[in-house]
């Protein structure tokens, strides 16, 4: 009986040591993300058992999120302080644009708060993934993600070079709210990476701005990209804004019927899914088949 008791103690001790090495070896094991992009990056970098909670219902919206199924199993913070505290996080991931009460989050929870700079280019996105991977001690996974992105981008650029010999397509982003993306935006970088020209950036317009109908006519793009969320936007109605307005009739994109609609998640990804967006943009611009 004593031998059995001693064996059980040793077995318990060994199991505790193994668990400590396997799970507690990492500095942060109750990580919470407060943004969709943070959710997407964390789920790509770390095991699910190190995630205590994710941003909210936005990650369940298939029009915007790339992680609809993966995100279902995690508590959703939704900016609720009580929920955040109850999750007992040791690390909170938050974007620099989410400034409300950031200074108080660490005090309320006792957690480290990591505020990341929102990327405005492909290279900045890779740097963020690398920095976050180092923070959560998943450097190898971070490098795998980056390598996958770079390999896919190289293959895409080779495909474009092989199959398209014309002038650089001149592209305009135009939202249903009448806004556009110029210099220092991920969209501008995505366009450059597929050998296109963002006509708004070319005109010297910076960041996100309203754009008038007159300016669209002046810029005369070859292609107009309209980001949409199908459950919110009426594609037919938006199409009529272009094709039934006689003032647009000489704009190349309208004349040649090259107004294309793309999901928001393919135009505005701030995570490793940026490469998916770049591939989708190229598919639309160059009309690549599957």
Predicted regions mapped to residue ranges:
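Sec-dependent N-terminal signal peptides
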Residues: 4-13
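Boundary at the C-terminal end of the N-terminal hydrophobic targeting segment
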Residues: 18-25
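Basic- and aromatic-lined ligand-binding clefts that recognize polyanionic substrates
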Residues: 29-44, 141-195, 267
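Structured C-terminal subdomain patch of bacterial secreted/periplasmic proteins
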Residues: 29-30, 34, 123-136, 143, ...
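A short, structured surface patch at a secondary-structure boundary
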Residues: 30-87, 91-97, 101, 196-199
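His/Asp/Glu-enriched short active-site or ligand-binding loop at hydrolase and phosphoryl-transfer sites
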Residues: 55, 62, 186-208, 228, ...
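Proline-aspartate-enriched helix->loop->beta-strand connector
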Residues: 81-97, 111, 212-229
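Flexible loop/hinge segments that line or gate small-molecule binding clefts
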Residues: 99-131
């Amino acid at each position: 009986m004593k031998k059995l008791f001693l064996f059980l103690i040793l077995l318990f001790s060994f199991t505790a040591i193994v668990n400590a090495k396997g799970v507690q070896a990492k500095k942060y094991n109750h990580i919470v993300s407060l943004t969709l992009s943070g959710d997407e990056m964390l789920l790509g970098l770390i095991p699910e058992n190190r995630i205590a909670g994710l941003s909210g219902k936005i990650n369940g919206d298939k029009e915007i999120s790339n992680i609809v199924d993966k995100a279902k199993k995690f508590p959703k913070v939704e900016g609720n302080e009580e929920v955040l505290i109850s999750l007992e996080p040791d690390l909170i991931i938050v974007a620099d644009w989410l400034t409300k009460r950031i200074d108080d989050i660490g005090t309320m929870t006792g957690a480290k708060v990591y505020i990341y700079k929102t990327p405005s280019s492909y290279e900045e996105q890779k740097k963020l993934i690398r920095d976050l991977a180092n923070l959560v001690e998943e450097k190898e996974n971070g490098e795998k993600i980056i390598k996958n992105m770079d390999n896919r981008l190289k293959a895409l650029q080779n495909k474009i070079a092989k199959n398209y010999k014309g002038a650089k397509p001149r592209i305009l982003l135009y939202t249903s709210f009448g806004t556009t993306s110029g210099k220092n935006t991920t969209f501008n970088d995505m366009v450059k990476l597929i050998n296109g020209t963002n006509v708004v950036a070319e005109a010297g317009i910076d960041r996100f701005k309203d754009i008038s109908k007159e300016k669209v006519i002046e810029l005369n793009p070859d292609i107009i990209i309209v980001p949409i969320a199908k459950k919110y936007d009426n594609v037919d109605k938006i199409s009529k804004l272009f094709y039934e307005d006689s003032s647009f009739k000489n704009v190349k994109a309208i004349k040649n019927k090259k107004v294309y609609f793309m999901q928001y998640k393919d135009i505005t990804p701030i995570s490793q899914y940026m490469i998916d967006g770049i591939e989708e943009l190229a598919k639309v611009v160059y009309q690549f088949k599957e």
